[in-house]
């Protein structure tokens, strides 16, 4: 939708110097909450197994500190009792902090409480639009960024474990 270039800042350059910097809205989501149709693969995967899509997002947003398998199993277990949103909404908050995105259309916990599949899809699309591929995992993305001379987003202070 907004070009193919990653949004992660290359070494030694400012964000505005990037050739793709103007292609994405700064401080805005690149897709809407209900734009699931924009990526059929993510939409179908999330409809069938939301824990997989969620887990892939978690691994990227948390920079590999939470393994995909662990996040997926926790999400699945909580889903059986209808509480997966409790585990999911903090990840949305972290994603928003990484990219300075607004809390819309409402609070993160409400988005996940009432629209978990749509929220997971939107978060996956956001990561893809900003240069990360959740389906390949954190380490593979780091390798890809290294080859392309691109660095991952800077973690906001206070988010480091």
From Swiss-Prot:
Position of the signal peptide: none
Recorded GO CC terms: membrane
UniProt keywords, alphabetically: Membrane, Transmembrane, Transmembrane helix
The keyword Membrane belongs to this UniProt entry's keyword annotation: yes
Subcellular location: Membrane
Annotated membrane topology: Single-pass membrane protein
Membrane-spanning segments: 71-89
Transmembrane helix in keyword set: yes
Major place of residence: membrane
Functional note: May be involved in heavy metals transport.
Protein family (similarity comment): Belongs to the cornifelin family.
Protein name, as recorded: Protein PLANT CADMIUM RESISTANCE 12
Organism: Arabidopsis thaliana
Name of encoding gene: PCR12
